Each structure stands twice: as structure tokens, then as C-alpha cells.
Regions:
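Central hydrophobic cores of alpha-helical transmembrane segments
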Residues: 93-101
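Membrane-helix boundary connector in multi-pass membrane proteins
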Residues: 90, 102-120
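Interfacial helix-start motif at the membrane-water boundary
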Residues: 57-74
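Juxtamembrane helix-break-helix junctions at the cytosolic face
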Residues: 72-92
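Structural signal for membrane-spanning alpha-helices in multi-pass inner-membrane proteins
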Residues: 79-82, 105-108, 131-135
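Hydrophobic transmembrane helix segments
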Residues: 29-62
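Cytosolic juxtamembrane helix and N-cap/initiation of the first transmembrane helix
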Residues: 2-32
Length: 145
């Protein structure tokens, strides 16, 4: 049997920019954030509660829905902010917003916390910690174009 070995060049690290890494981390955070809320609808009794105008201990009002949308909008906006702001401001904003969302993520576990919610919270916390780490260690010299 004659097998030819094809010589392939070694894989090359492309050096992804920090701001693109941050945008990717915020995107992952958003997917988890949204899916936890979506899967919440499959929990027994939750749709009935929503139809009666309650979510957890809160009445479903315009104010509640505005606050819920605002809490989702901030991480969604961070995807764009991470690639649009200048480095110095970008670094600060990412560290501050991620730090604020750490306790917020934990507070979302108040009351009834199912295993899928605990798993998502752990994954969200890991993503938020990576956001803080990458922003904190932002390179002084640009490594990408």
C-alpha cells in the first residue's frame, strides 16, 4: 500500500482583536440570557402565572416589561459597544457593565432555581469573568487591524 503524506502548513494563530473577543463573549451571554427566559415558559405553572399577570412575585406592568427589556438591552448593546468605542473607554465600560451583571445574574436565581438556571448562571458568570479579564488585560499595542 502506498500512502502519500501531504505536507500541510502549520495552523496559524490569527490574533483576534480584544474588542472582537468581547463582542463574542457578550453574544454568548445574550444567547444564554434569552434562552433561560424562554425555557422558563416550559416550567409547570409559569404560563398560567403569566396569563394571570404575574412573573415570580412581580405584577406584569408596563414598568416591569420596560425594566425587563432594559436589562436585556444593555448586554445586547454591549455587543456593538465592544467594537465601536475607543479602546480606553471600551475597556472601562466592559469592566463596569460586566461587574454590574455578576450580582444581577446571581439575583436572578432568587426563589425557584432549577438545574438549567443554575447551569446557565454558571456559564454566564464565566463569560462575564472573561469579559472583565480581557478588558483588564487590554493590550497596549494593537495586535490586529
Amino acid at each position: 500500500m502506498n500512502t502519500q503524506q501531504i505536507s500541510r502548513p502549520a495552523l496559524q494563530d490569527t490574533g483576534v482583536c480584544v474588542n472582537l473577543k468581547l463582542a463574542a463573549l457578550w453574544t454568548g451571554f445574550m444567547f444564554l440570557y434569552i434562552y433561560v427566559d424562554y425555557f422558563h415558559l416550559y416550567m409547570p405553572g409559569k404560563i398560567e402565572d403569566i396569563l394571570q399577570g404575574r412573573v415570580f412575585v412581580f405584577a406584569v406592568t408596563q414598568g416591569f416589561l420596560l425594566a425587563a427589556l432594559a436589562s436585556v438591552s444593555i448586554p445586547a448593546l454591549m455587543i456593538f459597544v465592544s467594537v465601536a468605542l475607543p479602546a480606553q473607554l471600551n475597556r472601562r465600560v466592559n469592566m463596569i457593565v460586566a461587574a454590574v451583571y455578576i450580582p444581577y445574574t446571581l439575583l436572578n436565581l432568587a426563589g425557584e432555581a432549577w438545574m438549567h438556571m443554575l447551569f446557565a448562571a454558571a456559564a454566564e458568570l464565566i463569560l462575564l469573568l472573561f469579559i472583565i479579564r480581557y478588558a483588564w488585560k487590554w493590550p497596549r499595542v494593537a495586535k490586529c487591524k
